[in-house]
């Protein structure tokens, strides 16, 4: 049973089918994740599996983290991630990994639907036309210096403020995003690779979280 796995984006390529079709895929390299903690309803109030991935220099590990990794008997990784088991995702005790064990790509299979979470590429400060797909105003016919301005951002005295969440200019990208219901095209257990149909958030080399689809 696939609970989830943390990997890194290695780029995009294509896979050809026997019929000659071309499928664009993202290559995710997911080395075996080391289990640092298994949470249960009795001790933590919910069921989850906490993992780490990658390597980190010992001098870069803080003492609380070093103690946590040492108790689990695993090497310190570049981060800690948690895969929570919801009520609809019931796993028996035999299927749950043990602390100090590992999770690899073998839990996934071709054709399976997954959700991929990553950090989008940062685009810097952007206006509303680029950031929110606002329509630009006229170039002529009385429009002076207001071609790409957003227009009105609210009312007058009532309510006398700008509502929270108003779409305005600001930082674009560099935020957490999830693409749902992507198909696993191929699983390469020997090279720890997942080939996922389509594009996923993030730059090459960034961390990705791959989970079984929640809405499949």
From Swiss-Prot:
GO terms for biological process: translation. GO terms for molecular function: rRNA binding; structural constituent of ribosome. The keyword Glycoprotein does not apply. Keywords: Methylation, Ribonucleoprotein, Ribosomal protein, RNA-binding, rRNA-binding. Methylated by PrmB. The keyword Cell membrane does not apply. InterPro entries: Ribosomal_uL3, Ribosomal_uL3_bac/org-type, Ribosomal_uL3_CS, Transl_B-barrel_sf. The modification N5-methylglutamine is found at residue 157. Residues 89-108, 139-158 are annotated as: Disordered. It comes from the Bacteria. Pfam families: Ribosomal_L3. GO terms for cellular component: cytosolic large ribosomal subunit. NCBIfam families: L3_bact. One of the primary rRNA binding proteins, it binds directly near the 3'-end of the 23S rRNA, where it nucleates assembly of the 50S subunit. Part of the 50S ribosomal subunit. Forms a cluster with proteins L14 and L19. Belongs to the universal ribosomal protein uL3 family. This is Large ribosomal subunit protein uL3. It comes from Halorhodospira halophila (strain DSM 244 / SL1) (Ectothiorhodospira halophila (strain DSM 244 / SL1)).
């Amino acid at each position: 049973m696939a609970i989830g796995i943390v990997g890194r984006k290695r780029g995009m390529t294509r896979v050809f089918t026997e019929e000659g079709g071309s499928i664009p895929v993202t290559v995710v390299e997911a080395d075996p994740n080391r289990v640092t903690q298994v949470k249960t309803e009795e001790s933590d109030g919910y069921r989850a599996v906490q993992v780490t991935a990658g390597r980190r220099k010992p001098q870069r590990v803080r003492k609380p983290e070093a103690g946590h990794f040492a108790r689990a008997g695993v090497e310190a990784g570049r981060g800690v991630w948690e895969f929570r088991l919801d009520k609809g995702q019931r796993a028996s005790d035999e299927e749950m990994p043990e602390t100090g064990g590992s999770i690899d790509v073998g839990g996934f299979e071709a054709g399976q639907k997954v959700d991929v979470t990553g950090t989008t590429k940062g685009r810097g400060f952007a206006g509303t036309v680029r950031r929110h797909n606002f329509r630009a105003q006229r170039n002529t016919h009385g429009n002076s210096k207001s071609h790409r301005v957003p227009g009105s951002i609210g009312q007058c005295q009532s309510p006398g403020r700008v509502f929270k969440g108003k779409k305005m200019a600001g930082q674009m990208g560099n935020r957490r995003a999830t693409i749902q219901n992507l198909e696993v095209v191929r699983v390469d257990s020997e090279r720890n690779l997942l080939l996922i149909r389509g594009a996923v958030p993030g730059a090459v080399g960034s961390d990705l979280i791959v989970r079984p689809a929640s809405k499949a």
